[in-house]
Amino acid sequence: MFRGASAVNLDSKGRIAIPTRYRPEILEINQGQMVCTVDIRQPCLLLYPLNQWEIIEQKLSKLSNFNPEERSLQRVMLGYATECELDSAGRILISAPLRQHAKLEKSIMLVGQLNKFEIWSESEWQAQIEKDMTLGASGQFAMSEALSMLSL
């Protein structure tokens, strides 16, 4: 399970180092294999261990090619999906199209979301967190039926 936000740097070759606390799980369960794709709702990337990505692929494959919205989701998520392998230094290479989508430069935030990571530019991450905190302070979370039942 991946939790917490880590500041990491993007090197000149487009690689980021996965924090050491996550590497054993990625190596043991997935032999270092991961898949990175775009988030269609946010200017960030989604990085899945291979076993978790395979679950997503199964869900995407069940969508209809004849429904325009479902086909669009398949096209974007599968079209951008790129296999990434953890190298001996614990780094993954993020392809240029993925870096461009998320506006990645040197300062990156790697954010654990239990079964995956989100990869954000530091500036986009800060802007998103401000929006999320403002939304939380406004009480709008309580308007969601599922969230109104959540006790933290």
Swiss-Prot record:
UniProt record similarity statement: Belongs to the MraZ family.
GO CC terms, sorted: cytoplasm; nucleoid
Protein name: Transcriptional regulator MraZ
Major localization class: cytoplasm
Gene3D superfamilies for this protein: Transcriptional regulator MraZ domain
SUPFAM superfamilies: AbrB/MazE/MraZ-like
Matching InterPro entries: MraZ (IPR003444), MraZ_C (IPR035644), MraZ_dom (IPR020603), MraZ_N (IPR035642), MraZ_sf (IPR038619), SpoVT-AbrB_dom (IPR007159), SpoVT-AbrB_sf (IPR037914)
Xref: CDD domains: MraZ_C, MraZ_N
Occurrences of domain SpoVT-AbrB (ranges): 5-52, 81-124
Keywords recorded for this protein, A-Z: Cytoplasm, DNA-binding, Repeat, Transcription, Transcription regulation
Domain of life per record: Bacteria
GO MF terms held by the record: DNA-binding transcription factor activity; transcription cis-regulatory region binding
Keyword set includes Cytoplasm: yes
GO biological process: negative regulation of DNA-templated transcription initiation
Oligomeric form and interacting partners: Forms oligomers.
UniProt source species: Histophilus somni (strain 2336)
The gene coding this protein: mraZ
Subcellular location: Cytoplasm, Nucleoid
Keyword Protein biosynthesis: no
